[in-house]
């Protein structure tokens, strides 16, 4: 049984004060949630403060990115160990915005994920195709390449700290959402790929999230699909009431 994971990616939003206010509003709204893992990902500067604010709650803390080196002359980067020190339990890696805007590569995603898992963080690894790739019927080719590259080199026991998030680039911040069936089709493909390339047991336990304009009015249909194990939520996670409604998708 895969525990659903609902993750809120706040992207480049909220000051420290605004992040703390959001957490204070959110905590009582999700305090009674059972059978679901909850994670929020504020900006780097708010991580430590939000970590203290989440203490004693059932909400986990994620960073939005990391670097693969532990330390050194890498100006502007943050290591997985430093994120753990700031209170993080999770880190988002390879988000489409990182790939599209900052040239993140499949190799870089793999190096970051391996470094994160090595220090005990759960890596939420993002994959997904552009609209051009979907229209040219390259969705499975692109997603397959990204998943295969991202999961290279992991040992069997490390997969418990890996989550895949399928986020079609054409649905990020556009208001467009993959239909329940479109999302399920790709999630099923990812799980079958892991079955064939790694093992049935790992595929069965691997959580695969959907990301891409997830909102309170579409999350229930998505979560009803057999291979969708949660959601990576952007804009709709910025308001406590909206995010809490999605955490409590079961009603």
Swiss-Prot record:
Main subcellular location of this protein, as a coarse class: cytoplasm
InterPro entries (alphabetical): Aldolase_TIM, TIM_sf, TrioseP_Isoase_bac/euk, Triosephosphate_isomerase, Triosephosphate_isomerase_AS
Catalytic activity of the protein: D-glyceraldehyde 3-phosphate = dihydroxyacetone phosphate
Any one GO CC term of the record: cytosol
EC number annotated for this UniProt entry: 5.3.1.1
Record-annotated active site: 95, 167
Keyword Cytoplasm: yes
Assigned keywords, A-Z: Cytoplasm, Gluconeogenesis, Glycolysis, Isomerase
PROSITE patterns assigned: TIM_1 (PS00171), TIM_2 (PS51440)
GO biological-process terms attached to the record: gluconeogenesis; glyceraldehyde-3-phosphate biosynthetic process; glycerol catabolic process; glycolytic process
Job description of the protein: Involved in the gluconeogenesis. Catalyzes stereospecifically the conversion of dihydroxyacetone phosphate (DHAP) to D-glyceraldehyde-3-phosphate (G3P).
Protein name per the record: Triosephosphate isomerase
Species annotation: Pelobacter propionicus (strain DSM 2379 / NBRC 103807 / OttBd1)
Lineage, opening ranks: Bacteria, Pseudomonadati, Thermodesulfobacteriota, Desulfuromonadia, Desulfuromonadales
Gene: tpiA
